[in-house]
């Protein structure tokens, strides 16, 4: 059963209903549910499907491709010696298929592009020279290495330039979708617990699938993150390595951003890392934004060139705050931290990030979903005449109204007293 993803399913269905061949690129961070979405949408039925081999060399990739062709029904398929031959074999198989629409699903496509394999040129030839000239091919590519798909396919300046006909940048679940997912698994969670779980795991479906019935939220987090063999105990390194060819530079940037709650300007990032030029930094920041690890925003009174980059990936932030600091390898770290000052300080900041990830839902709750608006944050450094202040969410509406939003994480409804009201008015 697919939770949410209605718009994404519609895109996939429309590709099949099209009168022309379609080239669909699906990308997004590791564990966000890309493969599951595609397989469930098509009922696990494809004319041809293949998954690249993690760390396989060219010979192994080609052998695996031939095995997939045999599994699809090409019984006497030979082992190709090159990718040109491999895609020629695929074309021959598809020509003989009786499927009205021939759905070709190539999963983990970036893994197939091994050094000196000439994969890209053969892939270009398959689409440009054959598939795009027909009306019955639906080519769906997918992969966690988002930077590869963006640079080598979507933003390619060579043979694949403007060839992708439909894109799906698969996003994490919203809080509502996580609630639906938890209910589908039979997990009994209050909305307070759902919010805290989201603050730790974000909206990554795979992470939520690891939660077990019968355990408290704290016990679940201990088991999957802090236990010696926890399923997510080493997720941080695997996450960035799966997405980026040279993950170290991306980790450098998110590490710097992780130290500044409100985010940093480009100049501040360059100063903090002391190793990146503007050009190199632009590429890394763009790819981190594509993958949903950071967001780029403008302060309410700032110009575009002073845009601020903020780390928003919940798991990464949780890693920096707690997992990386768990030097004693305490397997019950989270259970022992409940109601501690450290936990309370973290939860307030994490709840602010949760709200910032749901500005569309906040606008809907305020009844202004249909009003054109921009979302900003505002901060003022302390000086000799006044204290510093910060407003995390400003909704600047086209109807000449500005909504000022303060986020407070509380077990019960938060009551604004006279002192706090005056504090807000001073801002």
Predicted regions and their residues:
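Phosphate-binding site recognition
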Residues: 1-337
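A cross-kingdom feature that marks ATP-driven nucleic-acid transaction machinery
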Residues: 300, 307-427
């Amino acid at each position: 059963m697919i939770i949410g993803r209605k718009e994404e399913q519609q895109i996939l269905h429309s590709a099949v209903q099209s009168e022309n061949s379609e080239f669909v690129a699906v990308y997004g961070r590791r564990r966000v549910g890309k493969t599951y979405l595609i397989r469930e949408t098509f009922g696990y039925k494809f004319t041809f499907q293949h998954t690249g081999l993690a760390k396989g060399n060219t010979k192994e990739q080609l052998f695996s491709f031939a095995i997939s062709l045999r599994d699809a029904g090409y019984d006497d398929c030979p082992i190709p010696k090159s990718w040109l031959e491999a895609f020629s074999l695929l074309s021959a198989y598809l020509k003989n298929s009786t499927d009205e629409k021939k759905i070709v699903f190539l999963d983990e496509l970036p893994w197939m592009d091994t050094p000196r394999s000439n994969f890209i040129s053969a892939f270009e030839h398959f689409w440009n020279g054959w598939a795009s000239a027909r009306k019955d091919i639906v080519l769906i590519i997918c992969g966690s290495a988002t930077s590869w798909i963006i640079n080598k396919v979507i933003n390619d300046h060579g043979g694949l330039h403007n060839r992708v006909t439909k894109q799906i940048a698969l996003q994490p679940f919203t809080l509502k979708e996580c609630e639906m997912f938890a209910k589908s698994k039979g997990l009994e969670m209050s909305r307070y617990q759902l919010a805290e779980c989201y603050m730790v795991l974000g909206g990554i479906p795979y992470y939520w699938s690891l939660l077990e019935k019968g355990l408290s939220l704290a016990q679940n987090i201990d088991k999957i993150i802090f236990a010696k063999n926890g399923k997510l105990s080493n997720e941080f390194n695997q996450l960035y390595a799966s997405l980026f060819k040279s993950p170290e530079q991306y980790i450098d940037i998110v590490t710097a951003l992780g130290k500044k709650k409100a985010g940093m300007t480009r100049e501040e990032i360059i100063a903090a890392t002391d190793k990146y030029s503007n050009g190199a930094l632009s590429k890394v920041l763009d790819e981190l934004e594509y993958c949903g690890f950071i967001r780029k925003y403008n302060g309410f009174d700032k110009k575009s060139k002073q845009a601020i980059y903020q780390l928003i990936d919940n798991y990464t932030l949780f890693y920096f705050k707690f997992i990386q600091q768990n030097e004693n390898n305490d397997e019950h770290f989270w259970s022992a931290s409940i109601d501690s000052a450290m936990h309370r300080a973290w939860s307030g900041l994490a709840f602010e990030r949760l709200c910032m990830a749901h500005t569309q839902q906040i606008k809907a709750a305020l009844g202004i979903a249909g009003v054109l608006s921009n979302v900003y944050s505002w901060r003022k450094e302390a000086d000799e005449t006044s204290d510093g202040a910060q407003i995390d969410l400003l909704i600047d509406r086209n109807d000449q109204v500005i909504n000022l939003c303060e986020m407070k994480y509380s077990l019960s409804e938060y009551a604004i007293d006279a002192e706090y009201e005056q504090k807000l008015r001073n801002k």
